[in-house]
Design a protein with these regions (language model features):
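Alpha-helical repeat scaffolds
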Residues: 103-105, 134-145, 168-181, 200-212, ...
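Structural signature of alpha-solenoid helical repeat junctions
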Residues: 79, 116, 153, 181-185, ...
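Alpha-helical junction/boundary sensor with strong preference for TPR arrays
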Residues: 111, 148-149, 181, 214, ...
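Alpha-helical adaptor scaffolds
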Residues: 221-294, 298
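Terminal, low-structured helical/coil segments at or just beyond the last alpha-helical repeat
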Residues: 313-348
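Compositionally biased alpha-helical segments
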Residues: 27-173, 187-195, 249, 265, ...
Length: 348
């Protein structure tokens, strides 16, 4: 693993560790930590009226004043949730997806706060991504975007990043998505049709239009989908990869996963196994919302490490995959490969 990757991981972890601890049991109010440029962090208590990709609106406990804070100033949010919502989050964290889905759907039906409604939908998208159910994930994600076009939940956007040809049902749905007026719907449809022989040209044309969209999240994701197109056709150059890596480091955290996957594929095609592994490892280590994609990235990273002779690290990754992603296609492949490598390098 390169120093740059290690430094990036440390910065990412440090951001979380710096968050001030709140104890929600002390108050039924919502609690928010705000950090304005050049000032100390400021705790605010009250009722969150809305929380979008642009701003957080809060009615303070003291004075009942309405205050609005840019999303960029919001460090941490702790709110009270229903019992079903809390249980759903716990089940999701434990990987008990069927239980999580049941609890979260119950929470969805009883929740009347719009911004929390979006939070629950985002968790439901994660449940669907866990099992690779992109159709259900797409349905729930589009509900989020319909409520907030600039949502910060684009980290769960069920876009296609690999070069798999979609099945007939997915092609049908993706064409419907791409025909809608919503930029997010178009983006999702175009991403899944990029590998469909009959729709690839239309998909790429749509992505080029979206790459100039006024919504920066849509714009950046569409641009990374175009990187994917260049990579699949073998048109990407070393200069492209250098620019892409620099662009990724400037992106908001929630948008990086797919870009790192594409970068890893591009380095793999250009026979740069170490750099490919470094890019791919960002997914299982940090950006693992799409569990199926993270599993694939981890498997391919281990393959790349094996190519450069780092057998010990490759074996560790394959071994970890058996326990972490054992229920996925890539986890099963990892178990077979792990045993083969161990046997090949066993001491007589």
């Amino acid at each position: 693993m390169t120093n740059r990757l290690r430094d990036g991981l440390l910065r990412f972890l440090a951001t979380g560790l710096l968050c001030v601890f709140f104890n929600p049991a002390l108050s039924a109010d919502d609690q928010v930590m705000i950090e304005q440029q050049g000032r100390s962090r400021l705790p605010i208590t009250g009722e969150i009226e809305n929380f979008t990709g642009r701003e957080l609106t809060m009615r303070t406990r003291v004075g009942k004043k309405i205050r609005i804070f840019p999303k960029s100033e919001v460090v941490e949010v702790i709110a009270s949730y229903t019992q079903h919502h809390d249980l759903g989050r716990q089940m999701l964290a434990r990987g008990r997806i069927l239980n999580a889905t049941v609890e979260l759907n119950l929470a969805l039906n009883e929740e009347d706060r719009t911004w929390v409604h979006r939070e629950i939908l985002a968790s439901l998208v994660k449940c669907s991504l866990w099992t690779g159910d992109y159709l259900t994930a797409a349905s729930d994600f589009l509900k989020i975007v319909a409520s907030d076009e600039e949502t910060f939940h684009y980290n769960v956007a069920p876009l296609a990043w690999a070069d798999d040809v979609p099945d007939i049902k997915l092609v049908h749905e993706a064409k419907l998505w791409m025909s809608q007026s919503s930029p997010a719907s178009k983006l999702m449809g175009a991403s899944h049709l990029l590998c469909s022989p009959d729709s690839a040209d239309e998909s790429e044309s749509t992505l080029r239009q979206l790459s100039r969209n006024s919504n920066l999240r849509i714009q950046r994701l569409a641009q990374m989908q175009l990187w994917r197109s260049r990579t699949m056709t073998g048109a990407s150059t070393s200069g492209d990869l250098t620019r892409w890596e620099a662009s990724l480091e400037e992106l908001p955290q929630e948008l990086r996963a797919g870009g790192y996957f594409v970068l890893g594929q591009a380095h793999r095609k250009q026979m740069n196994p170490e750099r490919s592994a470094n890019a791919l490892l960002w997914l299982p280590l940090v950006y693992d919302t799409d569990r199926q994609l993270a599993a694939r990235a981890c498997f391919q990273a281990a393959e790349q490490l094996e190519l450069i002779g780092d057998h010990a690290q490759a074996i560790n990754l394959f071994s970890d995959m058996v326990f972490r992603y054992g229920d996925t296609r890539w986890g099963s492949l990892a178990e077979v490969t792990w045993k083969e490598i161990r046997a090949a390098h066993a001491t007589p």
